[in-house]
Amino acid sequence: IRRELHVTPAFLCAAILWPVLQQQQQHAEHEGLPAYQALQKAAQKVISEQIKRIGIPKRFTLPMQEIWELQWQLSRRQGGRADRMLEHARFRAAYDFLLLREQAGENLHNLGQWWTDYQAADPEQRLHMQQNLGREDGGARNNNRRRRGGRHRGGPKPDQAKTDQA
């Protein structure tokens, strides 16, 4: 705003409600939800509560929620995720929001600078940046993903096949 750049109402609402969203997300995570589901639940709750107080049109609430959800996705840069993120329609808003969060004092481990450098890099440099992600984080990966058991795509289960043949 100070630099007289265009700022959408959705971006402003996302910024104003960010602390409330973070509180709701922490509460949902304490209830046992994985981080991304907690974020989604918190976003829905914050938006529904705000709609009761002030009229926020859907054309603003949907981009708000997308900006919030992309904050989580911006931290997941492995594989082809970073390149796909650059193609996202709301990448620029999410990136600007990320920089704003860093300027406000959130410790995001230089994530904003990484994305700034990534955008300016050529394809070879981008590949190198992605390959170095694990090394920069001390080799630790975020393995909060849920693991699913093997999927059976059609056909009887092995136990059923034996009983059907008998």
Q: Which sequence ranges carry the predicted segments?
A:
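Catalytic cores of the polymerase beta-like nucleotidyltransferase superfamily
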Residues: I1-A166
